[in-house]
Regions:
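Aromatic-lined substrate-binding rim segments of carbohydrate-active enzymes
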Residues: 49-125, 143, 147, 151, ...
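N-terminal signal peptide
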Residues: 13-24
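Short, solvent-exposed loop/turn elements at domain surfaces
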Residues: 27, 36-43, 78, 254
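Classical eukaryotic N-terminal signal peptides for Sec-dependent ER targeting/secretion
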Residues: 1-11
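Transmembrane beta-strand segments of Gram-negative outer membrane beta-barrel proteins
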Residues: 23-33
Length: 268
């Protein structure tokens, strides 16, 4: 039997399921469950409530309190695009109902749901959508015709967190591993515009899924791409910033960029 653990959510997120802890500190412990059918789960005719219900039940049984899911992924089935690449809608006729079933399942299992809108995969393949990032008109079409109605659906879903894009750096020049690369400033603007919409149209929190610690450091890292100053340089906005950093920490480890590789800073 899994060991019982206190289920305490990150303070900046929903307090709907939060339990008080002796230390009064919050722990966001969760699982990455990005898809069942890549890019087709929501609005792509592949919704499987049994899969997600069973998965969420298992996640909860191990004491986790959050789960991360990819929504559009590379854009293969959602949102809806016109022939010239502008976004005209959220997706197919079942997009809204699929999304809200996922949201309600997470709530029923007392899980914070981190909805990752996009992935760097949108810059790969023949049907890629890198221009959604680089072309501000197309970015705006996504915000207006897909993200805005989506946020309306999510109104009141306090256990939901929005993630703009998974590992955006792999779409960005200098680090690009995709078929089409975008300028760093374009990706920052894309992220900031999504953050602005989320903050202007909802009470939800927003982040982005940086690929490495080295991209979120003004010290010994490559750059601090996602701090307030960097995002505002790319797109001046009082609210187009992140609520918290979300950094992927995976092989190869140990990394020279991890805090564990450096002596503690003096207390001032």
């Amino acid at each position: 039997m899994p060991q019982s653990r206190p289920r305490v959510l990150l303070l900046l997120s929903s307090t709907a399921f939060a339990l008080s802890s002796a230390s009064r500190q919050a722990l966001w412990a969760g699982v990455n469950l990005p898809w069942n059918q890549f890019g087709y789960d929501i609005g792509g005719s592949a919704w499987n409530s049994t899969y997600f219900s069973t998965s969420f039940e298992s996640i909860k049984s191990y004491g986790a309190n959050s789960v991360r899911f990819w929504l559009h992924a590379d854009g293969r089935s959602t949102p809806t695009f016109s022939e010239d690449g502008e976004v005209t809608g959220m997706g197919g006729p079942n997009f809204g109902s699929d999304l809200m079933q996922l949201v309600e399942l997470a709530k029923a299992h007392e899980l914070v749901l981190q909805l990752c809108l996009w992935s760097f995969d949108m810059c790969k393949g023949e049907d890629r959508h890198a221009d959604l990032i680089s072309n501000v008109t197309k970015t705006d079409s996504y915000v207006k015709n897909a993200l805005t109605p989506m946020l309306e659906l999510l109104r009141g879903s306090k256990h939901v967190v929005i993630e703009a894009i998974n590992e955006p750096e792999w779409c960005m020049k200098s680090f690009c591993e995709a078929d089409e690369c975008v300028e760093v400033s374009d990706m920052q603007r894309f992220t900031a515009k999504i953050a602005e919409a989320v903050h202007s149209l909802s009470t939800l929190r927003v982040t982005t899924g940086s690929a490495s610690l080295k991209f979120s450091s003004s010290g010994r890292g490559e750059a601090a791409y996602w701090n307030d100053a960097s995002l505002r340089t790319a797109f001046p906005s009082t609210v187009g910033v992140l609520d918290f950093y979300n950094v992927h920490y995976c092989a190869p480890l140990p990394s020279p960029h991890t805090p564990h590789s450096h002596a503690p800073s003096p207390t001032l």
